Regions:
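Single conserved hydrophobic/aromatic residue that forms the stacking wall/gate
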Residues: 1-5, 9-10, 172-173
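Conserved SAM/AdoMet-binding glycine-rich loop
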Residues: 15-138, 149
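Structured C-terminal cores of nucleic-acid metabolism proteins
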Residues: 137-172
């Protein structure tokens, strides 16, 4: 949906008394990449936050690959945007992240988290983690534990690896 279409829909809801808007997607930060308008998710959030009214904006889920300083700065700038971020890291091991085809590494993830916490000291940070990924070593598992301990998440959703139908890893036998 275009920025104008999204903004009009949300404006109608707010004028109707809605107090909380949640933008939901597998990777909300990729908003606009398929549009020719030159706008991204941070621009959409800013446009919504400028709509008159008393409401709160939430969103999930963000992909670390597309989470940008611009997004975090936008969140920090507008009081109507909840200082809450679900940013799945999946593994603390760069090798495992590469095997998962996640398109970021441990250091990049930590840089993004540190920046987000710097510009939003009251940030509520949640994440997802998968353990038992095929080929994950004990040392790589420990890298995941150390990342968890260093970030201090407010909430963490933990999963044991399970192959998903239609994916390359669905062909393996565990």
């Amino acid at each position: 949906r275009s920025l104008v279409g999204s903004e009009m829909c949300i404006r109608d809801r707010i004028e109707g008394g809605t107090k909380e808007i949640t933008l939901l997607g597998q990777n909300v930060n990729s908003y606009g990449k398929d549009l020719s308008c030159g706008m991204d998710f941070a621009d959409l959030l800013a446009a919504i936050a400028q709509i008159p009214g008393d409401f709160l904006i939430r969103f999930m889920t963000s992909h670390p690959r597309d989470a940008s300083e611009k997004l975090f700065d936008t969140m920090a700038r507008y009081p109507k945007i909840a200082k809450q971020l679900h940013l799945p890291f999946q593994s603390g091991s760069s090798r495992v992240l590469k095997a998962m085809n996640r398109h970021y590494d441990r250091e990049t993830y930590l840089q993004k988290v540190n920046y987000a916490k710097k510009v939003m000291p009251d940030l509520v940070l949640t994440s997802d983690v998968i353990v038992g990924f095929p080929g994950e070593t004990d040392e790589e598992f420990e890298e995941t534990i150390s990342l968890i301990q260093s970030v201090h998440y407010d909430s963490l959703f933990t999963f044991i690896f399970s192959p998903r139908p239609g994916t390359p890893l669905s062909l393996i036998h565990i």
